[in-house]
Amino acid sequence: MYGDLALQLVNSSHRTTLSSTPQLPLPKYALPLILSICLETRQLGTSIASIAESHGQLSLTQDRGLVCNLTVQHLAARRNKRCMLAYLATRVGGIKERWWDAGGGLAYLLSPAASASVNPEADAPDLRSALSPQELDFLRGYNNLLLDYKSDFLDVLDLTAGIEKPPGEIMVDVRVVRDAGEVFLDSGERVDFRKGQRFRLERAQVERLIIQGYLEEV
């Protein structure tokens, strides 16, 4: 039946928005389903054009059954388009959300480390494999746009810093939960973050590592 594939696409996208998990893995881009919907839409367009051409203008104004048939096909094609746009808009929102959750760290976001806690039964092991080539281009462009925007006042404000829990102190005690290796802090100090170690450092120096899951506050 017309529209069944589009409804399946929207339902699969809607289910991901119902979860309360903040780091819900983005489902893999549904390319086969998208192509099937596009094919159905093109077939509807071809059918509408063929019927309209074969019956002529006079029949289109007098034959109510014919008008009803064309209207149903036209509405089905428009519905397919709306469903695909809703699906893509949901994914774009999810991509942006994950960029902010990662503190603007694009390399980390696209690495397997960012999906270390993802359900092994997920259809995509990491974000990179879940995105289409066009979505990857969008993510890189979005990243470049935000980096360019915030570069003018980076010494005053970091837009990617979390604001849900404002820091209460300048210094913070952290424990390394995942090896990060040697990191040069803004102060020039070199710190070797190994799992299990504890440090007391300025929050601003390690905020990004906390967001990315290498460190946790203690």
Swiss-Prot record:
Its GO biological process annotations read: DNA strand elongation involved in mitotic DNA replication; double-strand break repair via break-induced replication
Q: Name one GO cellular component term.
A: CMG complex
Q: Which UniProt keywords apply?
A: DNA replication, Nucleus
InterPro entries linked: GINS_A, GINS_bundle-like_dom_sf, GINS_Psf1, PSF1_C
* Gene3D superfamilies in UniProt: 1.20.58.1030
State its location(s).
Nucleus
Q: Does the keyword Transport apply?
A: no
The superkingdom listed in its UniProt entry is Eukaryota
Q: Which Pfam families does its entry note? A: PSF1_C, Sld5
Q: Which CDD domains match?
A: GINS_A_psf1, GINS_B_Psf1
What is the protein's major site of localization?
A: nucleus
Q: How does the annotation summarize its subunit structure? A: Component of the GINS complex which is a heterotetramer of SLD5, PSF1, PSF2 and PSF3.
Q: Which family does it belong to?
A: Belongs to the GINS1/PSF1 family.
Query: What does the function comment of this entry state?
Result: The GINS complex plays an essential role in the initiation of DNA replication.
Q: Can you say what this protein is called? A: DNA replication complex GINS protein PSF1
Task: Please report the organism this UniProt entry assigns to the protein.
Answer: Cryptococcus neoformans var. neoformans serotype D (strain JEC21 / ATCC MYA-565)
Q: Which gene encodes it?
A: PSF1
